[in-house]
Amino acid sequence: MSRNGAKYRDLRDFIARLEAEGELRRIGASVDPNLEITEICDRTLKSEGPALLFEHPKGSAVPLLGNLFGTPRRVALGMGEVSVGALRQVGVLLASLKEPEPPKGMRDAFEKVPLYRQVLHMAPKEVRNAPCQQEVLRGSDIDLGRYPIQTCWPGDAGPLITWPLVITRGPYKARQNLGIYRQQVIGRNKTIMRWLAHRGGALDFRDWQEARPGEPFPVAVALGADPATMLGAVTPVPDTLSEYGFAGLLRGARTEVTPCILSDLQVPASAEIVLEGFLYPGETAPEGPFGDHTGYYNEVESFPVFTIECITQRHSPIYHSTYTGRPPDEPAVLGVALNEVFVPILQKQFPEVVDFYLPPEGCSYRLAVVSMKKQYAGHAKRVMFGVWSFLRQFMYTKFVIVVDDDVDARNWKDVVWAMTTRMDPARDLTLIENTPIDYLDFASPVSGLGSKVGFDATHKWPGETNREWGRPITMDAAVRRRVDEIWDSLGIFAGSRG
């Protein structure tokens, strides 16, 4: 598998590429990070507009970069592809890494050579004198107030760091975990680390507390890493592969990392800003409320406090930020692009899957539509349960709709037609109770625990129905071709207005 592999060394390389293609605009006016930047970015994103570099945000000498991944194409560019459709190749790569197969012969081995070459880029490369450590701040010089951290919505509890790349390592693991966990600012050197209990960072912290009770847990937070590293942290990377390794595959070059000053954690060498510090045992604080990707404010809940004891940064750093709100927002756009990555991964496990679609209106992952080549009675239910169980990204998907391969999974007119003509509610709804649900989903009766429902909107096979199944109406192919030939000459829409 060959890829374009755009080798952006850092965020600034990516900014230059976007600006050259008219995909980024510089904003010279002084705009307030308190609410105003959210409104500007939201209007721009909803119009499929460019990334925005606010050069003079009010109250800060540090520029703010927003709406970076505000279109699927910019996500694709960040992953080294030129189009959203090409992201299927990223999924093919991930599927082969998740379940590698030995070559079936010499010819197959030669065909796999490009993949083997790419694997050489997986191991990160440690460097010294990294750009991210050009300036080092300690003690009283540490002040998060120097950065234009957004307060996104009127009901938010305060400023929120929204694109933090959090690096952790558990006591039993050699590899580090990278994840995006938002952080509420509660002091000049303190934030609240909001991570859910099943996320990698939270699991590392739990294991650390068990193995080393009473000891502070080292954490590093990179702000403004290169696009491959950032996107690697939100992609369904196999458990055997580090996010740094996957970023190297995307980039076509090994990820450069550098050791932290306060710990042995490794951070992206080209990051704009790095926060180093510790989680101290027993120190928690109530987080929220904040406007979230659901379009609602989330509930207040306690999470660990992150105490920052060192900040390193590049000369003239850039602060990367986003906002979340009712779709479409940046997470929804990321979901649309990453949807293409998921398809080959599912198809590797379930070859009968034709397409898989996460509508952005479904808050990125809460509703999925799957089209499949049905082969036996009960087959749709097998695929349904496969979606819920195969990738952890879909453990929170509340609604799964399964349709036949003659239905376009991305066309609601097709999907609704299939649901209303191929479903009997009593037979074709599968309801599961007491399953894991996103704790932000206030519709569930208990926080973190709720129900899921599957819709079997496929043709029914013997054993699923006793009736003769309906035959879809289709025009004869020869008639369609004949009408295609004479269509323009009929002049039916000639001179029509609008």
From Swiss-Prot:
Source organism: Methylococcus capsulatus (strain ATCC 33009 / NCIMB 11132 / Bath)
Family: Belongs to the UbiD family.
This protein's pathway: Cofactor biosynthesis; ubiquinone biosynthesis
Known catalytic reactions: a 4-hydroxy-3-(all-trans-polyprenyl)benzoate + H(+) = a 2-(all-trans-polyprenyl)phenol + CO2
Pfam families: UbiD (PF01977), UbiD_C (PF20696), UbiD_N (PF20695)
Originating gene: ubiD
The EC number(s) this enzyme carries: 4.1.1.98
Protein known as: 3-octaprenyl-4-hydroxybenzoate carboxy-lyase
Function of the protein: Catalyzes the decarboxylation of 3-octaprenyl-4-hydroxy benzoate to 2-octaprenylphenol, an intermediate step in ubiquinone biosynthesis.
Subcellular location: Cell membrane
InterPro entries (alphabetical): Hemopexin_CS (IPR018486), UbiD (IPR002830), UbiD-like_C (IPR049381), UbiD-like_N (IPR049383), UbiD_bacteria (IPR023677), UbiD_Rift_dom (IPR048304)
Requisite cofactors: prenylated FMN; Mn(2+)
Domain of life: Bacteria
Positions contributing to Mn(2+) binding: N177, E243
Bilayer topology term: Peripheral membrane protein
Keywords, ordered alphabetically: Cell membrane, Decarboxylase, Flavoprotein, FMN, Lyase, Manganese, Membrane, Metal-binding, Ubiquinone biosynthesis
